[in-house]
Amino acid sequence: MNFKNIFLSFFFVLAVGLALVHAEDAQPRGPKITSKVFFDIEHGDKPLGRVVLGLYGKTVPKTAENFRALATGEKGFGYEGSTFHRVIKDFMIQGGDFTRGDGTGGKSIYGEKFADENFKLRHTRKGLLSMANAGKDTNGSQFFITTVPTPWLDGRHVVFGEVLEGYEIVAQIENVPKGRSDRPVETVKIVKSGELESEDKAGEKGSSHEEL
């Protein structure tokens, strides 16, 4: 191979590499995850494990903060000890009613209910976290996790997070035996919940610079 061919081959490889980098940068990025919370879950007396959820605090800050604070229980009430009271295969699992446990209760950190923040995000895939409601502007504490894409809920329910780890546990819950009103025969309970340190918050602790 002569020098000219080597030279052309080098620039061909370089051009392909740059094109791939550019294509990767051009890929649409998902919503920014600003907080991570966890649920440790039991079915009956059997531990299922931990589900880690990422919250979209840039896109829907009010909704994300409500869920985060209910996960930590820092307001004196929250998700710990509550159940997944409604489970529908090939649709979703629903929880968050920590006052009545049957889908008629719950409350937000802002009062009993708060308004729909926005509908920027859609129910495009499994593992998305969205607010359950009883109609327009009736968000409280109840939520659901999708197990399939649910586009018919777009514009009606606020998507505010996603499952980061432990989706296999969501799938197990989806398949538990159910009785009347899609309620699990054996209780599916959040035995512990809280917040995990996110990369953003860890970085803030190590830096004195203000974010622009």
Swiss-Prot record:
GO MF annotation list: cyclosporin A binding; peptidyl-prolyl cis-trans isomerase activity
Chemical reaction(s) catalysed: [protein]-peptidylproline (omega=180) = [protein]-peptidylproline (omega=0)
Gene3D superfamilies, per the entry: Cyclophilin-like
Organism ancestry: Eukaryota, Fungi, Dikarya, Ascomycota, Pezizomycotina
Entry keywords, A to Z: Endoplasmic reticulum, Glycoprotein, Isomerase, Rotamase, Signal
InterPro entries, per database record: Cyclophilin-like_dom_sf, Cyclophilin-type_PPIase_CS, Cyclophilin-type_PPIase_dom
EC numbers, comma separated: 5.2.1.8
Biased composition (Basic and acidic residues): 192-212
Principal location class: endoplasmic reticulum
Record-linked PROSITE patterns: CSA_PPIASE_1, CSA_PPIASE_2, ER_TARGET
Cellular component aspect of the GO annotation: endoplasmic reticulum lumen; fungal-type vacuole
Gene Ontology biological process terms in this record: protein folding
Motif interval(s): Prevents secretion from ER: 209-212
Glycosylation sites: N139
Role description: PPIases accelerate the folding of proteins. It catalyzes the cis-trans isomerization of proline imidic peptide bonds in oligopeptides.
Protein name as annotated: Peptidyl-prolyl cis-trans isomerase B
Family statement: Belongs to the cyclophilin-type PPIase family. PPIase B subfamily.
Location of the PPIase cyclophilin-type domain: 38-195
Chain intervals for the UniProt region annotation (Disordered): 181-212
Record bears the keyword Endoplasmic reticulum: yes
Matches recorded under Pfam families: Pro_isomerase
Localization per Swiss-Prot or TrEMBL: Endoplasmic reticulum lumen
Regulation: Inhibited by cyclosporin A (CsA).
Signal sequence residues: 1-23
